Amino acid sequence: MNYLVMISLALLLMIGVESVRDGYIVYPHNCVYHCIPSCDGLCKENGATSGSCGYIIKVGIACWCKDLPENVPIYDRSYKCYR
């Protein structure tokens, strides 16, 4: 039984798992995309399953994306937007 678990874990690590996450999509400088024209289209173009408008305190209305790939940057509250 333990061998089966170890083999399954090894296969999972070898195959690799593409993880996804939800978040506010941003430009490379941690500046959010605002909800005009459409968040759903923007999010889907970047590999998400869907998108909608959300609100961030001190930032305003921004695009919230569901199931974004790891390579797409999302909003990080610890960094400010700079252009």
From Swiss-Prot:
Gene3D superfamilies: Knottin, scorpion toxin-like (3.30.30.10). Residues 1-19 form the signal peptide. One of its GO terms (biological process) is defense response. It is found in: Secreted. It comes from the Eukaryota. Expressed by the venom gland. Keywords: Disulfide bond, Ion channel impairing toxin, Neurotoxin, Secreted, Signal, Toxin, Voltage-gated sodium channel impairing toxin. Disulfide bonds join C31-C81, C35-C53, C39-C63, C43-C65. GO terms for molecular function: sodium channel inhibitor activity; toxin activity. Pfam families: Toxin_3 (PF00537). The keyword Disulfide bond applies. Residues 21-82 form the LCN-type CS-alpha/beta domain. SMART domains: Knot1 (SM00505). Alpha toxins bind voltage-independently at site-3 of sodium channels (Nav) and inhibit the inactivation of the activated channels, thereby blocking neuronal transmission. This is Toxin Aam1. It comes from Androctonus amoreuxi (African fattail scorpion). The gene is H1.
